[in-house]
Amino acid sequence: MKLEFYIKHYGKSFYWAGKFLKKDIFADCSILYAFCRIADDLVDNNKNSKSKINKFIKEYSNVKSKNIIINQFKKIQIKYNIPNKFINDLFYGIKLDTKPVKIKSKEEIIKYSYYVAGTVGAMMAHIFSTNHPKAIKHAIDLGIAMQLTNIARDVVTDAKLGRIYLPQNFFRQNIKVKDIVNENFDRNKLFAAITKIIIMSEKFYKSGNNGIKYLPRAIRFPIFLASS
């Protein structure tokens, strides 16, 4: 399966924005995206998700892996000097999804969004070869914003997987999976919580877009498209 497939199929906005990037940069972004997507899919699509992701992480830690995507990712990690911290934080976030998820607060959902998406933004910034110290922070915020958007969009789908990302303190009661899936549940309460997530995301989108000026000029327009 071609690496470009992962962005074309799963990240449509970035795929089309990527057409404005240099081919080598877009190819490296595709490797990063494929690496992250495969790890995430191990959690979403398998009953033995914990053992699957642990095996993937072990493969990554090996000097040479049998997994082509892992080997290609490790090459770009060296090429762009991507810190291990972001990979380790990504793995930590993905492993959180191997068990039922119930987020308690706004602070907790932001932290979770950093682990699973802010880290990806930071790694993308390294591929874009930005040397400005503020660029990474803004890239992390853009990743968080995109994850919050995904959470707002996929509330019911996530609930069916046993995951409630809407913070419990957004409600006046203990929200359970059956409440979200049940059509008889007060949808106004649910929509109000989703609206809060969307409002939260806007602050992070603003920060992410403010960071575009720190990127090389050739990168700015594609990233603006991807974040729009």
Question: Can you annotate each of these PLM segments?
Answer:
Residues 1-147, 152, 156-228:
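Catalytic cores of Mg2+-dependent Asp-rich isoprenoid enzymes
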